[in-house]
UniProtKB/Swiss-Prot annotation:
This is Disulfide bond formation protein B. The lineage of its organism: Bacteria, Pseudomonadati, Pseudomonadota, Gammaproteobacteria, Enterobacterales. Disulfide bonds join 41-44, 105-132. Residues 1-14, 66-72, 166-174 are cytoplasmic. It comes from Blochmanniella floridana. NCBIfam families: PRK01749.1 (NF002485). It is a multi-pass membrane protein. Belongs to the DsbB family. Residues 32-49, 91-146 are periplasmic. The gene is dsbB.
Amino acid sequence: MLHIFYIYSKSRKFWAILICSSISLISIALLNQFFFLLKPCILCIYQRCSLFGITIAGLIALISPKTTLLRLFSIFIWLYSAIKGLYFSNIHMQTTLHPSSSLTCDLFVSFPNWLPLNKWYPIIFDSKISNCYSYPQYLLYLEISQWMLLFFLIYLIIAIFTIISQCHNLFQKK
């Protein structure tokens, strides 16, 4: 099974599927925001950033998926983005399903000074809603934050298998 992950990770199709899946989720979020007028909360913005991180990882690997260093760099970006997305979706799920005064969102989106996405692209990366449990949205009996938790968990599991397959192949050659 690890060999299959290793072989697929060296193909452009693998990375194109990763890019398409993350862009699909970003598109759904933007559709909800602009067409259905559902304003994103701060945790939604952070999850959106994690999806952009996964997309960037896929784009980097798409340049040359057979180059080991580039592929490993992309997998680590993917892994980090999936972990951060899982973290934010878990917090979002907890605040949505179990609202309390101890679980609250930040008042403002905070990005590093060297990457102020909320100032560069406020229409995508800024939120006017600081209350993360004010608008729970359901799809097929699950709240959106639960779906995002599931998606980030799938991204994380696939990224872990992919990085293990890379390490397995590197050590097997020696």
